[in-house]
Structure formats: structure tokens, C-alpha cells
Swiss-Prot record:
Positions contributing to Ca(2+) binding: E216, N294, D339
Signal sequence interval, chain numbering: 1-31
GO molecular-function terms, A-Z: calcium ion binding; electron transfer activity; heme binding; oxidoreductase activity, acting on CH-OH group of donors
Domain Cytochrome c: 619-708
One cellular component term from this protein's GO annotations in UniProt: membrane
Protein name as annotated: Quinohemoprotein alcohol dehydrogenase
Role, per record: Catalyzes the dye-linked oxidation of primary alcohols to the corresponding aldehydes and the (subsequent) oxidation of the aldehydes to carboxylic acids. Methanol is not a substrate.
Species the sequence originates in: Comamonas testosteroni (Pseudomonas testosteroni)
Assigned EC number: 1.1.9.1
Length: 708
């Protein structure tokens, strides 16, 4: 029987207590057979196809199934009565060991899905066989440039091409039949800082639109639109203003600058607001919507000492998809101070409120409130917290948060509830118009924060979280244990009544996104390695299957040759999954596809047993304190606290064989693990620093070792 790992203390809480290429090398490997079918299938995908498909959803042509990103399928061959009869049709090895966050897209039985390191796979869903694989050959030593694992949330399809945003900033167009590159653009050209792409591109009206992430690293947010056929850049919109001594790009930036205090010189640290995930499109209104990210640095007092809302951080922004021109915005967290991004997936829906039909945006960002907005004009309709929060008591009738002053007092340790991991992170939610419910992966990951009053941009320092790898948060993660408790749950949320209809508790935070169907079913993967089906109206568990590793992505469903299939890409990871896990099953990234009466055998699961605590490494006890500070600045977010965390998709150093720690310089300086994402600390750490790290690692293991 598999033993689940206890997450009752919350990984980040324990962490602080004890204390992230070139075109010529890209490669596609294609097989013959279904390639011609793939070409014909994707050639049909355009705006008309996507809108027509939304009426019946036989295919899953975009990551959210439709432009509204409802993740609702009208298929009902699999339903609440027969979902118990699902069996495996096939499984496909993605050959990855890091996080997999993509939703598979499927047209005419051809699946396209991305895995870690931006690798793209084309799969024949009739057999589960590979058609082709494209590897953009990302420099694996650049994993440190992103906070939250080397993940990719999926691809876009349009008129015979597959588009992927690569980790290193390339937007790449591939031939859907062969996987060969058609064109690429460097979306980071002319920009500064540690920039990465993890989000899926969207294609609206023949333009491929992509953002980037990196607000922890001192960058300025923007999204860019490129011609889907040629790759020509069409427009770019920035989410925060630049240096006010220079001309602003447009009127929206001029207005935004009035909400920032220039004494904070926010532009030197970028200001943040990166748009790294959610985008939707209303063709009738000719409007696209995008969620913006957190401030850079995180601390509001550091970035804008005299206050101000700091537009357009933590906002939903409406843009003209033809020109990128700003239309309106609604800011969900004015003066963001806690990494409360609004990049989380949004849904466009038409619902009745007070008896009247309304065109709305449904959104549950990191800050813990569920928002209903009028998508025609951005007007606030309602907001209600869906988890406990301590930064605001609610929102007034004008849509302004009623703040709690103590939550902004960065002079002393404060529990952030929710914390920077969010009450809801990137894990997609879904909306079922039959039940009227939104199926939302909710969570809490305890974190205790305090402002770093001595913060300076790009100045690494002992004890400053991940500053040695480029973080610029101006916050400390404190040693004081958070009072709040971790949890993960599936919420069925009524957006009209603004209350939960039902909920299911999970063993850990960081569970997968959801899919709901006309068959009255909700599917969700879990951190402890299961794909589960629930009754959409009641939450009753109807079926589950083991997945060999934790699930963070959302499933998709589609019809092929008259049969409905459900597919999910699994691979434990993301920022929480780097150092923690909820199951000892740690299999490779895999696509599982299920069908009624499926008879395929499940692949063998790999048990990653926690080893023995490190012992026998000689160290100087006087170096433990210095090693602690160096570890926090360079190692902790990937490796966790030695011997306390169990390791996620990156090993915990407190359970390594002593020979690894004794020879730590061989791994820290241009070591063999660079090909798996380990940074090179040459020039950043000294030999004496490494001795201090060894002292902290072995010293911590010794301190927590049970006494005989």
C-alpha cells in the first residue's frame, strides 16, 4: 500500500522555520503514418472552427476548449452513470522528470501536448503512438531563471501550425504534420532581466499572443502579438509604466504612472505585472482579456513608498486584439504587497444575476476572492472570499477592497493568508452551465512574510530568499511558524450566490486543474497521484485511477471514431512540487487516456522512497550559521530544508548519499547536474561558501535525527 507523505506542516512554513539556445540545434523527430491526417486536421483550425466546435465540442482545439476557456465539454457519452467503467486506452511516456502543466489539445484524433523544457509531442490518439517530437534544445543550466519549475502550459493550433512559447523566450511555429520549425521570434529582444515563458500562446484573429513571466526577477510585464502566418510582430502592450523621464508608449501608461511613487524608482526593478497565463477572447465584443501579475519587487512600500494603486498590477485588462489598444481594466488587488497575481485562469460566461442575463468574467485569483465582472465594461458586480483571508475583510459596492491595515505592516513578521502560492494558482478551473457551478482547485500554503528594509536591486545576500539566483522580492520568508494550516480542496462554487455548493478535501495543496462535462461529471487530478471523477451536482466520488505521480495539469476530452476519451498529462512539479510531494510514486511525465471499457495495462509506477538521513559528512560546526544563510539565498526553493522536506522532482539534500555532499563542489561548479537544470555557481559562491553549505546540510540532518 502506498504511503502518503504528511504535509500537515506546509512546505514553505517548514522551509523558513529552519532557517532556470539556438535555432540550429532544435530537432523534430517525425514518424510516417498519421502525419498527413495531422496536417489536414490542423489546417482547418481557425476562428470559425473554434467557435463552431464550441457548440458541440467533439474536439479540444484550444487549451481551454473554447475562446471563453470554460473547459466545459458538451459530450455526454461518458457520464455520471457509466464513468465507473472507464479504463485505460493507452499511455504515452513524455520522457520528462520535471513538472508537466499542459492541457492536451486534440483535433480529429491528433493530440498536441507540451512537456517540461518546452518539448512538444504529437500523438495519434487512436493508438497512443508518437507522430513526432520537437525539442527546442533549451540550455538546461538556465532552469534557475524561473521561480517555478521548467514547465510549459500548452500549445496553440492555427491553420496547419502548432505554436509553443519556449522557456528561453522564443515563440516557435511548427508544421503540424512534421514538427519542423516554420519560424521563430525572440520575444525577449531588447528586454532586461531573467525572463522565461511558461504559458501557452493564444491565437485570436490570426495573431499569436504570448506573454512572459519573471516578476520575482526584476522585470517589466508585457504581451506581444505576432502574425500567425509570418511571425511578424504586430503589437506589444506593457502592463506597467517605464521610466517616467522618458516618453510613455501610450495613454494607458501615462495614466498608470500617476498611481506609482517615483521616489521608489520602480522602473529600475521593472515594476512587474508579467502576464504569464490567462487570456480569453470575446469575438462579439472584439475584446481580449488578460490577467496581470505581481509587483516587482513584491513589497509595496519599497516599490512605491508613498502608496498608490500601482496600475496595472494584479488586474484584469481588456484590449483590442487587432491593435493591442487598452480598453478598460479592473484591479483586483490595488497596491499588491503579497505576490497576489491576477494571472490565474479566467472564464467568460453568460449567466443570470437578479433575473437579468449578464456577460461576465468569472475569476478566482491568488488573493482568495471570487470575482464576477461585467465583461462589456469591466464594472464590478460582486466578490466573495472562497478561502480564509487576512488582508481584506471584503469589497465595497464600488469594487474596492476593504483592507486590513495590519496586513500591510511589513515591519514585523506577518502571516500572509493566502500566501504567495495563492488561494488559487495557475491550475485551471471550469464552468458547467448545466449546474451553474465553477469547479475550482483551492488551497492554502502557509507563509510568513516581512519587508526587507535593506533590499537593493540585484544585490544577493545571505538569508535573502533565492537572491543568489536572481530573486528581487524585498521580502523575508520568516523563521516564525505561520499560524494558518495548509490545505488543498476542490470547490464547487456558485458565482451567482457567491458560495460553495460542495467541496472535497485533498491530502495536500497543489492539485490539478478541472474539466467538467454535459455528462454531469467533473474530473480532477490530485497531488497524491490520482485522476478522480466526481458528480458535478453533488461532489460524490464516482471513479478514480492511479497516475504514477502527482497531477497538476487539467484533463481534456474529445470524440474519436464515435467514442469519447479523457486524457490527462501528468508530471509532478511547479514551484510547490520542486521540493515537496504528496506521494512516493514519482513516475515520469505521462499522458494517460481513458475510455469506457478500456483494457490497456497501466505502466509500472516508480516508488521514490525516502532514503536514510545523511550522515558521516565531516564539517565545522562554526560554519552552520553561515551555511544556513547561504542555503536560503541559493538553494532552498529547489531542494527544500535538508531532511525536513522529502524532495519533489528535485532531490532533498538531507537524504542524499554522503559521497554527493562530500564532493559538493563537483556539483555546484559546472557539475553534471547542469543538464538537468542545476545552475552553475562559479563566480557566485566560493570554496569556503560550499564548506559552509555542507556544514548546514549535515548539521541540519544531525539536529533532526531521532535520538536512539
Amino acid at each position: 500500500m502506498e504511503r502518503l507523505i504528511d504535509n500537515s506542516h506546509g512546505w514553505p512554513g517548514r522551509m523558513v522555520w529552519l532557517l532556470a539556445a539556438c535555432l540550429g540545434s532544435a530537432a523534430a523527430f517525425a514518424q510516417t503514418g498519421p502525419a498527413a491526417q495531422a496536417a489536414a486536421a490542423v489546417q482547418r483550425v481557425d476562428g470559425d472552427f473554434i467557435r463552431a466546435n464550441a457548440a458541440r465540442t467533439p474536439d479540444w482545439p484550444t487549451i481551454g476548449v473554447d475562446y471563453a476557456e470554460t473547459r466545459y465539454s458538451r459530450l455526454d457519452q461518458i457520464n455520471a452513470a457509466n464513468v465507473k467503467d472507464l479504463g485505460l486506452a493507452w499511455s504515452y511516456n513524455l520522457e520528462s522528470t520535471r513538472g508537466v502543466e499542459a492541457t492536451p489539445v486534440v483535433v480529429d484524433g491528433i493530440m498536441y501536448v507540451s512537456a517540461s523544457w518546452s518539448v512538444v509531442h504529437a500523438i495519434d490518439t487512436r493508438t497512443g503512438n508518437r507522430i513526432w517530437t520537437y525539442d527546442p534544445q533549451i540550455d538546461r543550466s538556465t532552469g534557475f531563471k524561473g521561480c517555478c519549475d521548467v514547465v510549459n502550459r500548452g500549445v496553440a493550433l492555427w491553420k496547419g501550425k502548432v505554436y509553443v512559447g519556449a522557456w528561453d523566450g522564443r515563440l516557435i511555429a511548427l508544421d503540424a504534420a512534421t514538427g519542423k520549425e516554420v519560424w521563430h521570434q525572440n520575444t525577449f529582444e531588447g528586454q532586461k532581466g531573467s525572463l522565461t515563458i511558461t504559458g501557452a500562446p493564444r491565437v485570436f484573429k490570426g495573431k499569436v499572443i504570448i506573454g512572459k513571466r519573471g516578476a520575482e526577477y526584476g522585470v517589466r510585464g508585457y504581451i506581444t502579438a505576432y502574425d500567425a502566418e509570418t511571425g511578424e510582430r504586430k503589437w506589444r502592450w506593457f502592463s506597467v509604466p517605464g521610466d517616467p523621464s522618458k516618453p510613455f508608449e501610450d495613454e494607458s501608461m501615462k495614466r498608470a504612472a500617476r498611481t506609482w511613487d517615483p521616489s521608489g524608482k520602480w522602473w529600475e526593478a521593472g515594476g512587474g505585472g508579467t502576464m504569464w497565463d490567462s487570456m480569453t477572447f470575446d469575438a462579439e465584443l472584439n475584446t481580449m482579456y488578460v490577467g496581470t501579475g505581481n509587483g516587482s519587487p513584491w513589497s509595496h512600500k519599497v516599490r512605491s513608498p508613498k502608496g498608490g494603486d500601482n496600475l496595472y498590477l494584479a488586474s484584469i485588462v481588456a484590449l483590442d486584439p487587432d491593435t493591442g489598444k487598452y480598453k478598460w481594466h479592473y484591479q483586483e488587488t490595488p497596491g499588491d504587497n503579497w505576490d497576489y497575481t491576477s494571472t490565474q485562469p479566467m472564464i467568460l460566461a453568460d449567466i443570470k444575476i437578479a433575473g437579468k442575463p449578464r456577460k461576465v468574467i468569472l475569476h478566482a485569483p491568488k488573493n482568495g476572492f471570487f470575482f464576477v465582472l461585467d465583461r462589456t465594461n469591466g464594472k464590478f458586480i460582486s466578490a466573495k472570499n472562497f478561502v480564509p483571508v487576512n488582508w481584506a475583510s471584503g469589497y465595497d459596492k464600488h469594487g474596492k477592497p476593504i483592507g486590513i491595515a495590519a496586513a500591510r505592516d511589513g515591519s514585523k513578521p506577518q502571516d500572509a493568508v493566502p500566501g504567495p502560492y495563492g488561494a488559487h494558482n495557475w491550475h485551471p478551473m471550469s464552468f458547467n452551465p448545466q449546474t451553474g457551478l465553477v469547479y475550482l482547485p483551492a488551497q492554502n500554503v502557509p507563509v510568513n512574510l516581512m519587508d526587507d528594509k535593506k533590499w537593493e536591486f540585484n544585490q544577493a545576500g545571505p538569508g535573502k530568499p533565492q537572491s543568489g539566483t536572481g530573486w528581487n522580492t524585498a521580502k523575508f520568508f520568516n523563521a516564525e511558524p505561520p499560524k494558518s494550516k495548509p490545505f488543498g480542496r476542490l470547490l464547487a462554487w456558485d458565482p451567482v450566490a457567491q458560495k460553495a455548493a460542495w467541496s472535497v478535501e485533498h491530502v495536500s495543496p497543489w492539485n490539478g486543474g478541472t474539466l467538467t462535462t454535459a455528462g454531469n461529471v467533473v474530473f480532477q487530478g490530485t497531488a497524491d497521484g490520482r485522476l478522480v471523477a466526481y458528480h458535478a451536482a453533488t461532489g460524490e466520488k464516482l471513479w478514480e485511477a492511479p497516475t504514477g505521480t502527482g497531477v497538476v495539469a487539467a484533463p481534456s476530452t474529445y470524440m474519436v471514431d464515435g467514442r469519447q476519451y479523457v486524457s490527462v498529462a501528468v508530471g509532478w512539479g511547479g514551484v510547490y512540487g520542486l521540493a515537496a510531494r504528496a506521494t512516493e510514486r514519482q513516475g515520469p511525465g505521462t499522458v494517460y487516456t481513458f475510455v469506457v471499457a478500456g483494457k490497456a495495462r497501466m505502466p509500472e509506477f516508480v516508488a521514490q522512497r525516502t532514503g536514510q538521513l545523511l550522515q558521516g559528512v565531516k564539517y565545522d560546526p562554526a560554519k552552520v550559521e553561515a551555511g544556513t544563510m547561504l542555503y536560503v539565498a541559493n538553494c532552498v526553493f529547489c531542494h527544500g530544508v535538508p531532511g525536513v522536506d522529502r524532495g519533489g522532482n528535485i532531490p532533498n539534500l538531507g537524504y542524499m548519499d554522503a559521497s554527493y555532499i562530500e564532493n559538493l563542489p563537483n556539483f555546484v561548479f559546472k557539475g553534471p547536474a547542469m543538464v538537468r537544470g542545476m545552475p552553475d555557481f562559479t563566480g557566485k559562491l566560493s570554496g569556503d561558501d560550499v564548506e559552509s553549505l555542507k556544514a548546514f546540510i549535515q548539521g541540519t540532518a544531525d539536529a533532526i535525527r531521532p535520538k536512539p
